[in-house]
Swiss-Prot record:
Xref: NCBIfam families: sfsA (TIGR00230)
Family recorded in the similarity comment: Belongs to the SfsA family.
Gene3D superfamilies in the cross-refs: 2.40.50.580, 3.40.1350.60
Gene Ontology molecular function, alphabetical: DNA binding
Native source organism of the sequence: Thermoplasma volcanium (strain ATCC 51530 / DSM 4299 / JCM 9571 / NBRC 15438 / GSS1)
CDD domains with a match to the protein in the record: SfsA-like
Protein known as: Sugar fermentation stimulation protein homolog
Amino acid sequence: MEFTDLLPCTVVERVNRFLVNVKLNDKIVEAHLHDPGRLKEIIYTGNKVLVRRKSGKKTGYRITFGLREDQYILIDSGLHSQIASHFVSQECKPEVKIDDRRLDFACNDIFIEVKGCTLSIDGVAIFPDAPTLRGYEHLRLLERLAQEGKGAYVLFLIFSDATSFRPNSETDPRFSDEFYKALKNGVKFSFKRFSFDGKYLKYSGDILTFDGDDKS
């Protein structure tokens, strides 16, 4: 995926969950942050971010990448489905409603949910970085679909150079427990890693290993 309209900024203050004041060309402007995570290791005063201009929006700018350990990480979850669409069949339908939940893709009796992972520690990708009731409910739904004989998948987009993955049992033990339960009951997980070179977000291979106890 190519990005040609990125503007470098410096974080001034995170006003709330979705609004950040940034310094752009010596002027403080408001930028929308489209990511439900805490992002404490990325969104803090003085750190570098890359934004895109968004006409017709309240803030005018949208944060797309944030710097962490000399590497820019994608932090715009609004792009996740677009990225994931390169890895699913063109026959898949997006945003499919099942009961009172929505899943990102459905291909006949195969259902796929997409999650973006920005947090990594010592080469281990960790999700989530904040408690996620929505993520937990998605896993429960996919587990039920798997037990009904349908294909149930979670596609994790890993925006770091991590070499393994684990659910974040410290931050969200409920999600972590359900992750292993869903895995045991037929939900399939895929972990695709991406890197950014300043212009292109590139697929850089799959993570094939788990870190820690698989609770099997």
